[in-house]
Amino acid sequence: MSEEKRKQHFVLVHGSCHGAWCWYKVKPLLEAVGHRVTAVDLAASGIDTTRSITDIPTCEQYSEPLTKLLTSLPNDEKVVLVGHSFGGLNLAIAMEKFPEKISVAVFLTAFMPDTEHSPSFVLDKFGSNMPQEAWMGTEFEPYGSDNSGLSMFFSPDFMKLGLYQLSPVEDLELGLLLMRPGSLFINDLSKMKNFSDEGYGSVPRVFIVCKEDKAIPEERQRWMIDNFPVNLVMEMEETDHMPMFCKPQQLSDYFLKIADKFV
């Protein structure tokens, strides 16, 4: 294989309340071995200060920066698409629209919908198993003309004990400084038509299990894999919900192995 063909384009999608900034450790590791990396700020996230989450009524609109990026790619270019946490829903929307532009989709301890149920199904299951006290003071506020939207802002305790408990304290501080309100768009996703086997379901999928994740525990990650089986499961030991901070070198090595296998 030529050196040029070996170089891949990785597109990295953050989770709720985060931004492209959360890939700051992984991006240079992939670039150092010659790959192209685009870390996307979704709508009203990261440095997109043109809008707040209360201006974004649907998950489709929230995903627009990702779908616009894929639209802009040359017809013959395929990407390795990575989604973290809620970013799995953004991946699914992109995969449904552009299956031909994605070599493989990587669900990094991410919500992974199926094609049999509503797009909100995995979130509904997650919510039914997550008691209110487990959110540790995370703020939820209705928004929109009919109050059908629900914004979410992680509490410092939830971030420290539920998301970043094994990550460096400096990365926790970075997260506390840069965190913005997000949404899970559950009402909107419950009204969307199911993802299709021909679109979303046709793209090869990899799931990376983070074994010490307290936000989406290992059993919930494995339930999603059983619910909609993937092509490959990889595991990260002693890794919390933020593997890009907790184990950036191992994570980037995993991404390279995935690209070698599926591209």
UniProtKB/Swiss-Prot annotation:
EC number: 3.1.1.-
Induction: By pathogen infection.
Molecular-function annotations in GO: hydrolase activity, acting on ester bonds; methyl indole-3-acetate esterase activity; methyl jasmonate esterase activity; methyl salicylate esterase activity
Chemical reaction(s) catalysed: methyl (indol-3-yl)acetate + H2O = (indol-3-yl)acetate + methanol + H(+); methyl (-)-jasmonate + H2O = jasmonate + methanol + H(+); methyl salicylate + H2O = salicylate + methanol + H(+)
InterPro entries: AB_hydrolase_1, AB_hydrolase_fold, MES/HNL
Disulphide connectivity of cysteines: none
Keyword Hydrolase annotated: yes
Enzyme class: hydrolase
Pfam families recorded: Abhydrolase_6 (PF12697)
Functional pathway: Plant hormone biosynthesis; Lipid metabolism; oxylipin biosynthesis
Active-site residues per Swiss-Prot or TrEMBL entry: S85, D213, H241
UniProt keyword terms in alphabetical order: Hydrolase, Immunity, Innate immunity, Plant defense
Family: Belongs to the AB hydrolase superfamily. Methylesterase family.
Protein name according to UniProt: Methylesterase 1
